[in-house]
């Protein structure tokens, strides 16, 4: 619904506009600076400006609206239109009639239950369940106060009950088949038990003992077979690169190197043989094995008198 808003001057006002007749859109506030005068006047993004200082905005361009706002001095009067906020509700069709579904937004009161209020509201005897397996019996006690649950006796009883379920029962409870002493099986077991037995040995020790016994007659006592150590021949470092030597000064080159016709030189030695001009970033020429610049190379390659220099191009 339309409403009037007055912002006290002077500028800045603290909001940003968009739209206008040149954009075929109404003038709309798109941004509000927090803590500004527009925020204090409760302006919101999305508000449509209908008039500025009494002038309607339906025929204003974006630039005209900005000029009208800048012209405001001690105060700025805006007439805005703000859309009403509506709560969405689903449409329910019942017997061919569409009506909105009723929604109750009231909170339901809940009963306040402090901690411990639900423990033993009604006194009941604590009776152990019948037919409990003896192997899985766990002793636990319950009282009105949980302090007694952590006593030493209760902890020991609970631990004992849990261990009884984990540890298997003793073999003495199981019935064993009795063998009469006059039977042949009893005498055989009794004789084998009385005979002296040799100490048990592991499989690897028995194999080692057999190897020692088999070779005892072939070799003298106190000797053993030992393989001669084999020296591994390591090949030379084929991947290592030899240090290049400078073609001019003859010393080794470490670092940057200049290569020309399979010859290496220091960057400072890559100069003309006549004028010592550095040829690193220039053209160079080899004449009779020496390195020259273009000027001295042409001087050394002049044809004899009576001959002319002719440029030959390779055939296509």
Swiss-Prot record:
Per the database record, which ranges form the PDZ domain?
1-84
Please provide the Gene Ontology terms (biological process) for this protein.
actin cytoskeleton organization; heart development; muscle structure development
Transmembrane residue ranges? none
Question: Per the database record, which ranges form the LIM zinc-binding domain?
Answer: 244-303
* GO MF annotations, alphabetized: actin binding; metal ion binding; muscle alpha-actinin binding
Per the record, its GO cellular-component terms are: adherens junction; filamentous actin; stress fiber; Z disc
Protein's UniProt keywords contain Phosphoprotein:
yes
Read off the InterPro entries from this record: PDLI1-4/Zasp-like_mid, PDZ, PDZ-LIM_domain, PDZ_sf, Zasp-like_motif, Znf_LIM
Family matches, as Pfam families: DUF4749, LIM, PDZ
What are the protein's UniProt keywords?
A: Cytoplasm, LIM domain, Metal-binding, Methylation, Phosphoprotein, Zinc
- Localization terms from the record: Cytoplasm, Myofibril, Sarcomere, Z line
Q: Where are residues bearing Phosphoserine located in the sequence?
A: 18
Q: Which residues carry this modification: Omega-N-methylarginine?
A: 164
**Protein purpose:** May play a role in the organization of actin filament arrays within muscle cells.
How this chain assembles, per its entry, is:
Interacts with ACTN2. Forms a heterodimer with PDLIM4 (via LIM domain).
Name the chain's protein. Answer: PDZ and LIM domain protein 3
Q: State the species of origin.
A: Bos taurus (Bovine)
Q: Gene name on record?
A: PDLIM3
């Amino acid at each position: 619904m339309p409403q009037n808003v007055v912002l006290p001057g002077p500028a800045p006002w603290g909001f940003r506009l968009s739209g206008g007749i040149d954009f075929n859109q109404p003038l709309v506030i798109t941004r509000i600076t927090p803590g500004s005068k527009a925020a204090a006047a409760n302006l919101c993004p999305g508000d449509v400006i209908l008039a500025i200082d009494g002038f309607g905005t339906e025929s204003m361009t974006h630039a005209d609206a900005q000029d009208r706002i800048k012209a405001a001095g001690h105060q700025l009067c805006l007439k805005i239109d703000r859309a009403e906020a509506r709560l969405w509700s689903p449409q329910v069709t019942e017997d061919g009639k569409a009506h909105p579904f009723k929604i109750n937004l009231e909170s339901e009161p809940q009963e306040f239950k402090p901690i411990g209020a639900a423990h033993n509201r009604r006194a009941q005897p604590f009776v152990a369940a019948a037919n409990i397996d003896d192997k899985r019996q766990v002793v636990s006690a319950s009282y009105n106060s949980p302090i007694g649950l952590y006593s030493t006796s209760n902890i020991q009883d609970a631990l004992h009950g849990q261990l009884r379920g984990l540890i298997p029962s003793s073999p003495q409870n199981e019935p064993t088949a009795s063998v009469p002493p006059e039977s042949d099986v009893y005498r055989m077991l009794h004789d084998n038990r009385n005979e002296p037995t040799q100490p048990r040995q592991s499989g690897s020790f028995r194999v080692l003992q057999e190897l020692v016994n088999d070779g005892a007659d072939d070799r003298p006592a106190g000797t053993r077979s030992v393989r001669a150590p084999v020296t591994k021949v390591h090949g030379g470092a084929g991947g290592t690169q030899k240090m290049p030597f400078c073609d001019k000064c003859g010393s080794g080159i470490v670092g940057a190197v200049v290569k020309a016709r399979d010859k290496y030189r220091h960057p400072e030695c890559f100069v003309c043989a006549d004028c010592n001009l550095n040829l690193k970033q220039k053209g160079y020429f080899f004449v009779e094995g020496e390195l020259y610049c273009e000027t001295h190379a042409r001087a050394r390659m002049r044809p004899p008198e009576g001959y002319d220099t002719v440029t030959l191009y390779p055939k296509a």
